[in-house]
């Protein structure tokens, strides 16, 4: 492995069917940059609706992008403590939207939140449960406020609870999207987080399972209608460079990837695939091959700079001596 500037180049022999060059940036990247890019990318209504339909409705086009409405992602609930002082609970979701679902001639509303994780969160079920509970609590408080304002008739029980018998809550669903390259080894439900007890005790505790999207486990990429599916598929192969090369060079969908998706891939998995600056789409297959060739040339320049002879490089890189000598002359001219 060679380190050239901030670029890592992994190589075996450089010719034939043997390991080809992989041209990477700092793989760790900035967690803040990844979080910002993930939020920006998934906030798009088309991709948001696509994710919901693929994950929640088996690909059926239930949620339409045009029927999504951005909601305040701050979950706030104020309650009175034992000393009659108000206590405020506040959490910040990544994304929250109201969706309209049409079914059998009826129209329903639901709230869908998306939490994106670039690292495993070992308390995710409780975190999601708190988000959802705060939202339901806020809905109840809003219903009580509305009833007080209207001053309509109510029973003693309805007055005490603030929530009337006919009142109903808007369903809240949270999708957790894991964008890390490592396997998710965290809990997937509340029961996964509980200490081991008697099965009879477990049966008494309601479970809370999260809707978890893990690219490495997805086998339903055909459900996606936007390039979000391709982005998740690249993330799935991000730790297997041969698989990624095969995906990018053999799947025709990657010949016309929108630049936003390519930029998301670059940030989320730490690669540096050049964007097409002359248009809105990038041929990732060509960009991959161009980048591989540039990495090949960069490695040869580095070997020349370190004192390797053209003959040694020719044998290592499986290149003709003429090709290496041409790069040698180019390198010499640049040095001068």
PLM feature segments, named:
Residues 1-336:
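Elongated, amphipathic alpha-helical interaction scaffolds
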């Amino acid at each position: 492995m060679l380190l050239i500037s901030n670029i890592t180049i992994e190589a075996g022999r450089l010719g034939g069917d043997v390991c080809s060059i992989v041209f990477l940036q700092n793989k760790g990247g900035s967690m803040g940059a990844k979080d910002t890019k993930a939020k920006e990318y998934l906030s798009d209504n088309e991709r948001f609706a696509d994710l919901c339909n693929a994950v929640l409705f088996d690909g059926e086009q239930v949620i339409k992008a045009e029927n999504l409405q951005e909601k305040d992602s701050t979950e706030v609930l104020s309650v009175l403590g034992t000393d009659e002082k108000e206590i405020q609970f506040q959490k910040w979701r990544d994304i929250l939207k109201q969706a309209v679902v049409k079914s059998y001639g009826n129209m329903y509303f639901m709230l869908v939140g998306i939490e994106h994780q670039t690292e495993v969160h070992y308390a995710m079920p409780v975190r999601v449960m708190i988000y959802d509970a705060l939202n339901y609590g806020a809905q109840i408080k809003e219903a009580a406020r509305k009833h007080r304002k209207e001053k309509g008739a109510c029973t003693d029980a309805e007055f005490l609870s603030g929530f009337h018998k006919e009142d109903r809550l808007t369903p809240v669903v949270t999708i957790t999207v894991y964008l890390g390259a490592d396997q998710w080894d965290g809990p997937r439900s509340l029961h996964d987080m509980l200490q081991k007890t008697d099965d009879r005790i477990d049966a008494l505790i309601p479970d809370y399972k999260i809707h978890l999207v893990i690219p490495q486990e997805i086998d339903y990429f055909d459900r996606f209608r936007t390039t979000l599916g391709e982005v998740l598929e690249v993330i799935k192969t991000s730790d297997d460079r041969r698989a990624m090369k095969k995906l990018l060079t053999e799947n025709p969908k990657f010949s016309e990837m929108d630049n936003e998706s390519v930029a998301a891939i670059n940030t989320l998995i730490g690669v540096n695939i050049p964007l097409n600056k002359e248009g809105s789409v990038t041929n990732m297959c060509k960009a991959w091959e161009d980048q591989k060739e540039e990495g090949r040339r960069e490695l040869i320049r580095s070997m020349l700079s370190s004192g390797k002879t053209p003959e040694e490089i020719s044998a290592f890189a499986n290149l003709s001596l003429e090709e290496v000598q041409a790069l040698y002359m180019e390198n010499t001219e640049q040095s001068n």
